[in-house]
A protein has these predicted regions:
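A common structural junction motif
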Residues: 23-30, 92-96
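Terminal, regulation- and interaction-focused segments at domain boundaries
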Residues: 1-28
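Short proline/glycine- and acidic-rich turn/helix-capping motifs at secondary-structure junctions
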Residues: 37-43, 104-107
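A short, structured beta-strand/loop element
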Residues: 45-68
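A conserved amphipathic terminal alpha-helix motif
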Residues: 81-107
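Short amphipathic alpha-helix segments
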Residues: 17-27, 41-53
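Short, exposed beta-strand/loop patches in secreted or surface proteins that constitute
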Residues: 34-41, 61-64
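Secondary-structure transition/turn motif
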Residues: 50-54, 73-80
């Protein structure tokens, strides 16, 4: 199952870069940065995984500079996407509340 989260932000530094440099705080929300841009893949993406037991899935994060928007795809196979989505939204609203203008979740 895939869930897409669109986060429209104020102009400024890439939110994906800020998330990538915030590993200590990510762990407080049960998330860990597992990958960041590889030379063989499109630039501007990161991948998060949950550290909570029994909570699978991954979050693929892409920063759209022109739209100043963060696009997050939550991908799970059999697990409920709710817990990992909630962890991400909680983290974003706690850390970047002033930068976020709109947050939309599309199941």
């Amino acid at each position: 199952m895939q869930t897409v989260i669109h986060v429209v932000c104020t102009p400024g530094v890439s939110l994906r870069d800020r998330i990538g440099g915030d590993e200590r705080r990510l762990t407080k929300f049960g998330l860990v940065l597992s990958e960041q841009k590889r030379m063989s893949r499109q630039q501007g993406w990161s991948k998060l995984h949950s550290t909570r037991p029994g909570q699978g899935g991954a979050i693929n994060i892409h920063w759209d500079r022109a739209a100043t928007a963060l696009v997050c795809r939550v991908v799970t196979r059999t697990e409920d996407p709710g817990p990992i989505t909630g962890d991400l939204v909680g983290y974003l609203l706690t850390r970047f509340r002033r930068r976020i203008q709109a947050l939309t979740i599309v199941p």
